[in-house]
Every structure is written in structure tokens, then in C-alpha cells.
Regions:
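Alpha/beta-hydrolase superfamily serine-hydrolase fold, recognizing
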Residues: 1-276
């Protein structure tokens, strides 16, 4: 199913696609939400269609979200778009035979950044308040973050021009300014377990490696999949070249991690119940 409107305005920027295995038309399935990349200024959900289809074949209901792009809006408006989609998903998930108790989310590049911050906002009210965003939370158990554009204000080609378009010209004077740093404890400690993916040829590899160190400093549950030097394995290769053997490995490993987190969460709930 494609181009389902998740907002009342019926804008092309407020639509989502749904993928499910052909051999499981009505079976309740675990859910993966996907947010496409493009540096928050480019891209569309169609770029990720083969990635989503391949993930769906592993037995998931995959929901791919479109959202507005900078400079037509600010980063905070993009967060509002994602939360509007979350609200629609929560209200309609049973219609699509999705299991809300087994829900995960993935994003690549700018989409990984957007996903990270939206999940932080829904789990940490201080971040949402500083952004002046109203979350519509979903019980996301784990994140898959591929070649994440986590940092937006470094002294590099991204940080030199993008922040004013993302956050507004005077963002450094706002309450949100401390949260532009994704290593802020309010961000890190609000996230569910994370599966990080990068590669030696990923031009944003240093972003993932720095973010991984921040997770490690806070003893946050995570896994890093870092591929060695290979000319084929560039930025977000598992999304743009989803049929590579390494892409298959990435998608399968991410799925395995999600299932591992789900099992450990369920086991913990059973142990808690038994202790009462």
C-alpha cells in the first residue's frame, strides 16, 4: 500500500507506505518504522523502497514515512510530521495487522538523526519542551541507525551551513541549543537499545563512531556493525544498494538484534511478574 495520508491536509509530504510479506496477508506482524535519509534537505520515502521490501520479507510490517524537507520548514516541523505519522500509526496499526507490542524503527543518514531526536523527545519531556514539539509516543523497543547524520553543528561542510536552516538563525540563544549536541545525557539516556551501522568508506563514519562512544560512556545498550574498507560499501549502502551481500547481512543482523531485544524485554517482564 502506498501514499496513505497520515495528516488531514493530504499533502504529498504527509504520506506513508506500508510493506508486508505476500505470504502473510492478515497475520499480526512485528512492525518496523522507516525514516528516509537525505540530510534533512533531500530524499523521499521511495528511495528506501527496496530496503523496506527486503526488511518486510523477514516477516515485518514495514511503514515508511514521508516528511517535509528543509528549507521549506525547520527541523522542529519535521519532528511534528514524524509525530503526526506516529499518531496515525497508533490509531490504525490494528487495521494493518501490526503488533504494537513489538515495534522498532530504522533510519539512515538524516533520517537516523530525525529518528533519534524524535524518540528522545517522546521519552524525555525536557527535550520536547525545548523544541516546542508535542510528541505522540509509540513504544519503540529498539532503533536501527544507519550512517547517522547525528551531528549538525560541527566545523565541517554540514555544520557550517545547515544549522540556521534546521533550527533558525538565532538557535544558539534558545532553550534547544544544548540539545543540538546528540551526546547530551537527556538524548542518550532516553533512547531504547540501538543498532549502529557504518563502514570505512562511509563519509559520516566519524559521526557514528563518536555517537557510539557517547552510548558506551553512558553504558547504554547498543551494537556497532562497522564494515572494513571496500569501495562498494559507501554511505548508507544497505539502503541504496540493498541487494549487496553486505546489505543482506546488515538487514538480517538488525532484525536479529531487534528479536534479541524483544526476547530479553519479554523475559525481564516475566521475571518481574514472578517476583511479585
Amino acid at each position: 500500500m502506498s501514499d496513505i495520508s497520515y495528516a488531514a491536509d493530504d499533502s504529498p509530504s504527509h504520506r506513508l507506505d506500508i510493506y508486508r510479506p505476500l505470504d502473510k496477508p492478515e497475520q499480526e506482524l512485528p512492525v518496523v518504522i522507516n525514516i528516509h535519509g537525505g540530510g534533512l534537505i533531500l530524499g523521499c520515502k521511495e528511495f528506501n523502497r527496496y530496503f523496506c521490501a527486503r526488511f518486510s520479507k523477514l516477516g515485518y510490517l514495514v511503514i515508511s514515512i514521508e516528511y517535509r524537507l528543509v528549507p521549506d520548514c525547520l527541523f522542529f516541523d519535521q519532528c511534528e510530521d514524524i509525530f503526526s505519522a506516529f499518531h496515525y500509526i497508533r490509531d490504525h496499526l490494528t487495521e494493518y495487522h501490526g503488533n504494537i507490542n513489538e515495534l522498532y524503527a530504522t533510519g539512515d543518514s538524516g533520517g537516523a538523526c530525525l529518528l533519534t531526536y524524535c524518540v528522545a523527545m517522546q521519552n524525555q519531556p525536557a527535550v520536547a519542551k525545548a523544541a516546542n514539539v508535542t510528541p505522540h509516543p509509540l513504544p519503540i523497543k529498539a532503533l536501527g541507525l544507519i550512517s547517522g547524520m547525528f551531528f549538525t553543528n560541527k566545523w565541517d561542510s554540514i555544520g557550517l551551513f545547515l544549522p540556521r536552516y534546521l533550527y533558525g538563525r538565532h538557535y544558539k540563544r534558545t532553550a534547544y541549543a544544548p540539545y543540538v549536541n546528540p551526546e547530551h545525557p537527556d538524548i542518550i539516556l532516553s533512547l531504547p537499545p540501538c543498532f549502529l551501522v557504518t563502514s570505512e568508506r562511509d563519509n559520516l563514519r566519524h559521526y557514528t563512531m563518536q555517537f557510539e562512544k557517547a552510548l558506551a560512556r553512558h553504558d547504554h545498550t547498543h551494537v556497532l556493525l562497522d564494515f572494513p574498507d571496500d569501495a562498494r560499501l559507501t554511505h548508507a549502502f544497505s539502503v541504496f544498494e540493498p541487494f549487496l551481500p553486505e546489505s543482506t547481512k546488515t538487514i538480517q543482523a538488525m532484525s536479529d538484534y531487534f528479536q534479541q531485544i524483544n526476547k530479553s524485554t519479554n523475559d525481564m517482564m516475566e521475571e518481574t511478574y514472578e517476583l511479585r
